[in-house]
Amino acid sequence: MVPPTGERSLTKAISARALRKVYPGTPPVEALGGVDIDIADNEFFTLLGPSGCGKTTILRLIAGFEHPTSGSLDMFGQSLLDLPPYKRQINTVFQSYALFPHMSVAENIGFGLEMLGKPKSEIKSTVAEMMDLVQMSHLADRQTSQISGGQQQRVALARALAPKPRVLLLDEPLSALDFKLRKNMQLELKRLQTETGITFIFVTHDQEEALTMSDRIAVMSDGAIRQIGSPRDIYDHPADRFVADFIGDTNFLPADVIATEGERVSLRLGSGKTITAPARHAGGGRVTLAVRPEHARLEAEDSGLLPGVLSDAVYFGTDTHFHIALDDGTAFVLRQQNSPDTETRFAKGERVSVSFPGEVAQVLRD
């Protein structure tokens, strides 16, 4: 039974402990440095990070294309370490869809089932079900060389879903699509995952893809997981400076702790003004304050927390980005949503100040 939308199963589809992968060489290359991870059944889970961070290595270990150097890797409680790829009930969708151009849409979708020796009647009904799922029934007899990139993506997904895998791995499958089609496919992928109830493990370097589709995200760098959480938790409460910088746009401000009380901290900013903010870190010393551009506002010079000069205002249609050179030498960007009656009160070169409520500031230990 598929859990209701938004409710995650307690069953672990994938569980890894101290998972490590070292490639031989001079010197050896540690692609994965002892990762612990649990991915729930019926979860859309994303591995997010820059190139070379280890996210695709995890995917290849789960698929069975690589063998870990050490550590454990289980699927629904069964060890995968000695299980060959074809016995894992796992399918993979790659960046290149690897469709057969001389075959029709229906033939491509049914190819894997034929290789498994399924009866023709079962293949026919499953192919019809998959074409309906990805909304491609009207193109069943069209060759895949004659359909669009987005339609090819749907065929590749249908082919991977047809054998009813327990886990579907997706290795940056949207990167070849144009911007508008990519956004549409983000919604499509989440719909497919919800309707099928299959665990999706998605690899990407694109933060928007991760935030849009995922139930949870693992942010990775240098072969390690920096933070695992819901999109909102990771965006609003980054664990460290790397996560705050990689997910969304962020301003970083130096600050000094002057007092702590429970989970709140009083800080002195570079301007000499003070602010109280929630903090996971206790103690004194120098910290970094992370403030999202949309959480700040532009004010007159003597009204805000951080005085400076408005160096630029860039119009983006839906919003305007204001670039401020703060008096302490820090560059600050804030974002204001536009509306038909929006007016910019300040001109380039004018003295201004930046304000933000303490509740939206994230305190990061240096």
UniProtKB/Swiss-Prot annotation:
Positions of the ABC transporter domain: 14-247
Checking Pfam families in the record gives: ABC_tran, TOBE_2
Which residues bind ATP per the record?
49-56
Sorted UniProt keywords: ATP-binding, Cell inner membrane, Cell membrane, Membrane, Nucleotide-binding, Translocase, Transport
Query: Which InterPro entries does this chain map to?
Result: AAA+_ATPase (IPR003593), ABC_SmlMolc_Importer (IPR050093), ABC_transporter-like_ATP-bd (IPR003439), ABC_transporter-like_CS (IPR017871), Mo/tungstate-bd_C_term_dom (IPR008995), NA-bd_OB-fold (IPR012340), P-loop_NTPase (IPR027417), PotA-like (IPR005893)
GO cellular component terms listed in the entry, alphabetical order? ATP-binding cassette (ABC) transporter complex
- Specify whether RNA-binding is a keyword of the entry: no
Q: Name one GO molecular function term.
A: ABC-type polyamine transporter activity
UniProt-annotated location(s)? Cell inner membrane
- The EC class name is translocase
Membrane topology per the record?
Peripheral membrane protein
Q: Could you tell me the superkingdom of the organism this chain comes from?
A: Bacteria
Q: What is its EC number?
A: 7.6.2.11
Q: Which reaction does it catalyse?
A: ATP + H2O + polyamine-[polyamine-binding protein]Side 1 = ADP + phosphate + polyamineSide 2 + [polyamine-binding protein]Side 1
Q: Which PROSITE patterns match?
A: ABC_TRANSPORTER_1, ABC_TRANSPORTER_2, POTA
Q: What does the function comment of this entry state?
A: Part of the ABC transporter complex PotABCD involved in spermidine/putrescine import. Responsible for energy coupling to the transport system.
What family is this protein classified in? Answer: Belongs to the ABC transporter superfamily. Spermidine/putrescine importer (TC 3.A.1.11.1) family.
Q: How does it assemble?
A: The complex is composed of two ATP-binding proteins (PotA), two transmembrane proteins (PotB and PotC) and a solute-binding protein (PotD).
Protein known as:
Spermidine/putrescine import ATP-binding protein PotA
